[in-house]
């Protein structure tokens, strides 16, 4: 579901605290999230560089909102599930905790060991096999678990 022009304008107005038609570039991630997008930290840093100024206007927000590389949580969920399914040759719906830890700390928008430790406190790891349901993991991440890279 896309945000309407009115919703984008309303969002911009909320972040434009002094009504000067400008919003701090530091708020770009929060703006996009409030409009239903889910930019990664890397996305946000790239957008800040692209904007190239300390502030942005409504037209910049509209342009950025339309970018296809800024995913919704549902799009991110599908992509993550597809990636885990590709790794799951046996089709069990699980990944070993040690393998997951390795992936999360070394690939893509990787996480710190401390962030992975926090995540592991939130997910269920089978005490017998050490396996993690990747569907449950993805739901935890997409539902708003505050990880820097996601």
From Swiss-Prot:
The keyword Metal-binding applies. SUPFAM superfamilies: EF-hand (SSF47473). PROSITE patterns: EF_HAND_1 (PS00018), EF_HAND_2 (PS50222). The keyword Calcium applies. Ca(2+) binds at residues 16, 18, 20, 22, 27. Pfam families: EF-hand_6, EF-hand_7. Transmembrane segments: none annotated. GO terms for cellular component: actomyosin; extracellular matrix; myosin II complex. This is Myosin, essential light chain. The gene is mlcE.
